[in-house]
Structure formats: C-alpha cells, structure tokens
UniProtKB/Swiss-Prot annotation:
Protein source organism: Prochlorococcus marinus (strain MIT 9313)
Protein name: tRNA pseudouridine synthase B
Xref: InterPro entries: PsdUridine_synth_cat_dom_sf, PsdUridine_synth_N, tRNA_psdUridine_synth_TruB
EC number: 5.4.99.25
Record lineage: Bacteria, Bacillati, Cyanobacteriota, Cyanophyceae, Synechococcales
Keyword Transferase appears in the UniProt entry: no
C-alpha cells in the first residue's frame, strides 16, 4: 500500500483530545506516521491539521498564525480560565455598552505580554504546568510576548454577560488567558465560554472534514488527502533539473540564484507573517523555500545559505 503524503484537515469535535484524533487517523489510513499541528483543548472544536507520512516533517515550516471564534463569559473565575475548570468565584458584571466593551478590548490588540493559564502545557521547572496544577500547586508562570493582530467584537449580551468575538493571533497565544485578563481589567472576572478554531497553519474551516467514525474507523473510507504543496503555498519554490536533483538526493548544496525561484503562489498577508512554530530551529529566521523535483513534486525544504547557494534542510527520498 502506498503511504499517503499530505494533510487532512479535521473538524475536531468537543470532548476528545488532539491525540485522540491522531490515533483515529492512524487506524483509518493504516499507518503509524501521523502527526497534528497545533494542539486543541478537549472542549475546543474546529480546525486540526493532520499530517500523514513524511508530511509530518513539514509541520515546522507551516505558518503559525491561528484564528478563532468564541465567547467570553463575564463574572466567573475558574481554575483553568474556561468553564471546564473549578469555579473559584462568581460576581455580577457591570452595565456596559458596546463602545465600553470595545475600549476594554483595545489593550489586547497588537504585541502584548500574556501569562499562560495554570492549566496549560507550558513547562515550569521541567514539568507541565497542568500536571502541577492538578496536584493543587500554584505556580508563577512567566508572561511571554504574543501578537493579537485582530480582535473583533461580534456581539455583547448584557443580560447573559457574554462577549462573542473573532481573533487572529500568533502561535503560542492562549485565548483562555485573553478571557481571564479581560475579566480582570473589567473588574468582575471572566473565563472562556466556548471556542472554535477557524484557521491554523494556513488551513481554514472550509477545508475541514468530520472526524471518521469512532466505532469503525478502519472501515471508514479515508478522507481526501491535500497534497503537500497546498500547505506550502506561502513559500517560494525552486524547481530542480535532473543534475540538480541527483545532488539534492544526496543531501548536497545546490548552486542557484534567487531569480530562479518561483514566487509564493499565496504569500502570507501582513498579519500572518510570523516565524514558523519551531522557534528552536536554527534556520527559522532564514529565507525558506520549497524544493520541487523534475516531476513537480515536493523534494524537500531548503534555505539560502548565501545569495548563490541553497542548503538542504529536509530531503525526501534521500540517497546514500
């Protein structure tokens, strides 16, 4: 059986983990090499990109920005900053109009400092914060820099104390923290009511398909696989000739000029231009490009070592 090479965008339902989705897709496709991009909390629904086969090696090179639609509940503080946590306190929210809500949202737009929730996957002294929180420990989690490019108020319900919103943000942003911090600014506390991710790693909700049946995933017809180039449309491309392809397959540098590159078919908008999720990658800040073989398929990833040299970063079907 041919191992699939590409992506499936799952519309993750509530109540299961991102890893549960990966496990089910392994059974559907009958392969072990499956990964996902951008963990979603169990209660959160929406876009979950699934990488199949060697496409898992492409995940660090996809755009990291994400978009969400959701609701913030005023008047409630919880242990996890969403409604799945234990209720810490409850109080009435003030009378507010739409203009006042907009004014409260303004400080959260742009480049800001944000402290992750106590119940989160952030490492604190070598251990996940959520593991320590479940033991009843309280810890100081350092704030970190994130970017909220767009925070749109959709509706304010005074009677229910609910703020409906759209947000477009950088990788590493916690929407639960946004809800918590907004509540503290208003003075009544708040937590996340519900959340749906509408865009992640360059994929959007219109591309998402339902998660295959839990009871008989092996009998389910596998969903269509999006080709790798679909996910890499934000990067320029370098087409190899036969001689270059032989060198490339052996992991050797390619001599080329930047004017030989094809421009990115769908370059990122200004509010999406951030570094790839893998910030520890030494090539993360270099000019990445997709390398295309003689058949027009993805041969790997590379970056410009200098103005005339392309250095391999990921090589598919390597020889030697």
């Amino acid at each position: 059986m041919t191992v699939p090479f590409g992506f499936v965008v799952i519309d993750k339902p509530a109540g299961i983990t991102s890893h549960d989705c990966v496990s089910r897709m392994r059974r559907v496709f009958g392969i072990k090499r499956v990964g996902h991009g951008g963990t979603l909390d169990p209660a959160v629904t929406g876009v979950l990109p699934i990488a199949l086969g060697h496409a898992t090696r492409l995940l660090p090179y996809l755009p990291g920005a994400k978009s969400y639609r959701g609701s913030i509940q005023l008047g409630q503080r919880t242990s996890s900053d969403d409604q799945q946590g234990d209720l810490i306190s409850k109080q009435a929210w003030p009378e507010l109009n739409t203009a006042e809500i907009e004014a409260y949202l303004e400080p959260f737009r742009g480049r800001i400092q944000q402290r992750p929730p106590q119940v989160s996957a952030v490492h604190v002294q070598g251990e996940r914060a959520h593991a320590r929180a479940r033991r009843g420990e309280t810890m100081e989690i350092p704030a970190r820099t994130i970017t909220i490019d767009r925070l749109q108020l959709l509706n304010w319900n005074q009677q229910l104390g609910q703020i409906d919103f759209n947000v477009h943000c950088s990788s590493g942003t916690y929407i639960r923290s946004l809800a918590r911090d907004l509540g503290e600014l208003i003075g009544c506390g708040a937590c996340l009511g519900w959340l749906k991710r509408t865009q992640a790693l360059g994929f959007h909700e219109q591309q998402a398909v339902p998660l295959p049946d839990r009871d008989n995933p092996a009998l389910t017809t596998p969903p269509a696989v999006l080709p790798p180039l679909t996910a890499l449309a934000h990067l320029p491309r370098l087409q190899l000739n036969e001689e270059e392809q032989e060198s490339w397959s052996c992991g050797r540098r390619i001599t080329a000029h930047q004017d030989q590159c094809q421009p990115a078919p769908k370059p990122l908008a200004s509010d999406q231009q951030e570094s790839a999720p893998n910030q520890t990658d030494p090539s993360a800040n270099k000019s990445m490009l997709v390398v295309i073989d003689c058949r027009g398929e993805v041969a790997g990833m590379a970056y410009w070592e200098d103005n005339a040299t392309v250095k391999p970063k990921v090589v598919f079907n390597a020889q030697g």
